[in-house]
Amino acid sequence: RRQRQMCIRDSISTGNFNEKTARIYADSGLFTSNEIIVNDLYTLFRVLQKEVTEPKFKRLLVARFNLLPELRRRIGYEINMAKAGKEARIILKMNALQDPAMIDELYKASEAGVKIDLIVRGICCLIPNQPYSRNIRITRIVDSFLEHARVWYFHHGGKPLLFMGSPDWMRRNLYRRIEAVTPILDEDLKQQLIDMLAIQLKDNRKAGWVDENLNNVLKRNPEEEPVRAQYAFYEYLKSCLLYTSDAADE
């Protein structure tokens, strides 16, 4: 409660609260009291209860409604930036990349000069190292924990946009299911996710490139400082918690 008024907080996660999978899955979650997101979630549950058939979402991106149009807009923005000779970057972390339409969007972005990094744990139907995908790299991490988070980064002219949610880029997720994605609005949380993606892209112990034959090629280079992303990010989060605790004590 906030000054005798009810304060509603919602949780949006890339996974669920399961006592078994929580021990082995690596997920990301957001607790928020942002009124716009809270209201969007309320609308979403009304959709699930069949009380609303044509919902209007202000912040939340929901499959079968506004998710795909917004993804195309975000990719299109990066394409326009690249064509204008400005920095254009996309980083997409997910479990699976299979939808032909969205793969074509990424090919178009690559051809326009957008630098794209994909972190895909499972099935990936995009083929790198081709003339139409020369600006796309695919990383796969297989380590102690199952990589389960879906986090999407768009450079957006130096004002990064971060999104997090449940859908992979598969036809079943984008066209048939109800899946939700939230923007990350808090700048500190944005930076944490950006740092997570950066650490994962530096992994040279448990990560591999996916080549044009869709085979895994280990990144290991004896001349580079070893980085094991899952453990490095764990230490990173511990340092964030210690910093927060020290700041609270001052």
Describe these PLM feature segments.
Residues 25, 87-89, 115, 133-136, ...:
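Active-site lining segments that contact anionic ligands and/or coordinate catalytic metals
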Residues 233-235:
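Intrinsically disordered, low-complexity eukaryotic regions enriched in glycine, serine
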Residues 2-11, 243-248:
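Conserved small/polar residues in nucleotide/adenosyl-binding loops
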Residues 9, 78-85, 106-117, 146, ...:
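Proline/glycine-anchored alpha-helix kink/cap motifs
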Residues 5, 10-72, 76, 160-166, ...:
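Signature of lipid phosphatidyltransferase scaffolds
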Residues 1-5, 13-35, 119-154:
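HKD-type phospholipase D/PLD-like phosphodiesterase module
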Residues 74-137:
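Primarily the HKD phosphodiesterase
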